[in-house]
From Swiss-Prot:
PANTHER family: 4-DIPHOSPHOCYTIDYL-2-C-METHYL-D-ERYTHRITOL KINASE, CHLOROPLASTIC (PTHR43527:SF2). This is 4-diphosphocytidyl-2-C-methyl-D-erythritol kinase. The lineage of its organism: Bacteria, Bacillati, Bacillota, Bacilli, Bacillales. ATP binds at residues 95-105. Its EC number is 2.7.1.148. Gene3D superfamilies: 3.30.230.10, GHMP kinase, C-terminal domain. It comes from Geobacillus thermodenitrificans (strain NG80-2). The keyword Signal does not apply.
Length: 290
């Protein structure tokens, strides 16, 4: 039996870093939501083999233990003494190293899919706990939908989904090191977003308040070092997005837009100078294990 699983990207509507913890991680508080830009994971049993094979049409996707989907399969095999092999085919649509949790979502989709393929019977909560061992964003990606993430990002509290709107994303042709961004973050000199205000706006389904409440403390570092990201933000505002923010540590910038005609204007304007531009919708529902 082959199994196909969708692996949607996420954006951060609000991202705050509170302090650096004794274990070296940063304590964060953020609101994340999934969007309808997704990779496709296909899981293919390998009868008679006890191996994990990863293939992708994208040459930037590693095919070994550096790949988070590979790590997800390896973790399940080791934890539950699975002696079955699997091929993991990853069709990439989410840009790589973009601040959209593409690798984490691939890992989460692999966990959900192998839970079914190998008949492990794990709950979403149990899968998320396993996912947190792989990476901070994997736990959220197991759940999907919209949630507040705390701790180092692995403590997930699901909340209501925002009202439907367009999300236009633009990724400049640069890579940003998340570790470097956190290293250069000076918490005493940044403006901290009001994450609770974002949660309240979502619960009230108040689109205007959501747009007013977007914020990302990591912009303070990335925008200074990468003027291309700041330029995309400026242009997205100029073309008419209702709210504009960098996702994660960057470099992808997204705009929230309510109306179709304005979305088209923003999308077309950005396509004039940026190769990787996407117009997608927010995804309201959480993942099901069915």
């Amino acid at each position: 039996m082959r199994l196909s699983v969708k692996a949607p990207a996420k954006i951060n509507l609000s991202l705050d870093v509170l302090y650096k913890r004794p274990d070296g991680y940063h304590e964060v508080k953020m609101v994340m939501t999934t969007i309808d830009l997704a990779d496709r994971i296909e899981l293919i049993p390998l009868p008679g083999e006890d191996a994990i094979r990863v293939v992708s049409q994208n040459r930037f996707v590693p095919d070994d233990s550096r790949n988070l989907a590979y790590q997800a399969a390896q973790l399940l095999k080791e934890t539950f003494s699975i002696r079955e092999g699997v091929a993991i085919s990853i069709t990439k649509h989410i840009p790589v190293a973009a601040g959209l949790a593409g690798g984490s979502s691939d890992a989460a989709a692999t966990l959900r899919g192998l839970n079914k393929l190998w008949k492990l019977g794990l709950s979403v909560h149990e899968l998320a706990e396993l996912g947190a061992q792989i990476g901070s964003d994997v736990a959220f990606c197991v759940y999907g939908g919209t949630a507040v993430a705390t701790g180092r990002g692995e403590i997930i509290t699901p909340i209501s989904s925002p009202p439907p709107c367009w999300v236009v994303l633009a990724k400049p042709p640069i890579g940003v090191s998340t570790a470097e961004v956190y290293r250069n973050l000076q918490l005493e000199h940044v403006n901290h977003p009001d994450v609770d205000a974002m949660v309240g706006a979502i619960e009230q389904q108040d689109y205007a308040a959501i747009c007013r409440s977007v914020g990302n403390v990591l912009e303070e570092v990335t925008l200074k070092k990468y003027p291309e990201v700041a330029h995309i933000k400026e242009q997205m505002r100029r073309f008419g997005a209702d709210a504009v923010l960098m996702s994660g540590s960057g470099p992808t910038v997204f705009g929230l837009i309510e109306h179709d005609s304005r979305m088209q204007r923003v999308y077309n304007g950005l396509r004039g100078f940026c190769d990787q531009v996407f117009a997608v919708r927010l995804l309201g529902e959480r993942h099901s294990l069915d």
